């Protein structure tokens, strides 16, 4: 088997945090403090933020409060301002951040997330030698990697983190089809309003999800065009894995009919039946 070091020592940045944010000055500060205050080595972490250019309060709080905090820690960081794209184009923020990232691994973070694990960055490093989608544990208890952690190589192969708005579902379904999801002992608390009662704000209220209408809206995550595209993207990554000698039997057998249920291993990680409503469409 050919080996490829996905955490090369010559790269001073191991992990790039990709963080789109809107309208949440205090939660933005909190999400970064819980992340970086519990990091073993913040100097090897890069924070990349995406702001809407009309989000003046959020930008001001970042400049006045968060930026000095990052400077004091010695953390690499950068921020990109966008003409507002909106939640339905969330992936475009992330794809642009990923394009400019320095890290060997990418970590999609949220401005309503709270890190609960000390030395979480070392846990990622300890699991970053091979090509996996790393799945942290969350209060969702969901089979998806709600906060995807993936090698930069993924973006090099596919050209993006996700072509669809629902980034966690996209990367998770591709990874489950390849049987390359690896759960790591990192706990993240997602303080989303419908989960915890926190952050009932305009950002949450304007959160439109392109799912649950696959027969009606061609933008829907489970529309046949997107399902076909996920297969195509999975094939690209499978070809890369084949080239380095990784086992892709699970995916290949599913495509030829030898494996009748490509989602069987994902379902085992779904004790609360979170995906039950999409069983016929995933």
What are these regions (language model features)?
Residues 14-16, 46:
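Cell-envelope/extracellular polymer assembly enzymes that use nucleotide-activated donors
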Residues 33-44:
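Short, acidic, metal-binding catalytic loop of nucleotide-sugar glycosyltransferases
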Residues 43-56, 80-84:
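Short beta-strand/loop segment that forms part of the nucleotide-sugar
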Residues 49-66, 114:
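A conserved acidic beta->alpha catalytic loop
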Residues 94-105:
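Active-site nucleotide-sugar/metal-binding loop of Leloir-type enzymes
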Residues 103-114:
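Short beta-strand-to-loop acidic/aromatic patch adjacent to the donor-nucleotide binding site
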Residues 113-114, 118-152, 162:
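Conserved donor NDP-sugar-binding/catalytic core segment of glycosyltransferases
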Residues 169-282:
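C-terminal catalytic/acceptor-binding lobe
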């Amino acid at each position: 088997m050919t080996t490829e070091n996905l955490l090369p020592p010559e790269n001073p940045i191991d992990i790039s945090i990709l963080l789109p944010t809107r309208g949440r000055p205090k939660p933005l500060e909190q999400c970064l403090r819980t992340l970086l205050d519990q990091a073993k080595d913040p100097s090897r972490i890069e924070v990349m933020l995406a702001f809407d250019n009309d989000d003046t309060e959020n930008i001001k709080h970042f400049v006045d409060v968060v930026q000095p905090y990052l400077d004091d820690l010695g953390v690499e960081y950068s921020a990109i301002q966008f003409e507002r794209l909106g939640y339905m184009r969330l992936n475009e923020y992330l794809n642009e951040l990923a394009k400019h990232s320095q890290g060997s691994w990418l970590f999609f973070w949220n401005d309503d997330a709270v890190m609960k694990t000390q030395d979480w960055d070392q846990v990622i490093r300890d699991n970053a030698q091979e090509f996996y989608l790393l799945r942290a544990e969350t209060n969702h208890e969901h089979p998806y990697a709600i906060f995807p952690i993936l090698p930069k190589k993924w973006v090099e192969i596919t050209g993006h983190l996700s072509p669809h708005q629902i980034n966690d579902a996209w990367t998770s379904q591709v990874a489950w089809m390849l049987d390359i999801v690896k759960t790591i002992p990192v706990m993240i608390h997602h303080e989303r309003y419908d989960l915890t009662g926190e952050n009932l704000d305009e950002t949450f209220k304007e959160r439109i999800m392109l799912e649950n209408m696959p027969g009606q809206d061609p933008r829907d995550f489970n529309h046949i065009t997107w399902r076909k595209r996920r297969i195509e993207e999975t094939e690209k990554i499978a070809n890369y894995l084949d080239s380095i000698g990784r086992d892709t039997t699970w995916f290949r057998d599913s495509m030829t009919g030898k494996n009748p249920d490509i989602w069987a291993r994902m379902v085992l990680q779904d004790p609360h039946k979170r995906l039950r409503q999409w069983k016929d469409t995933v």
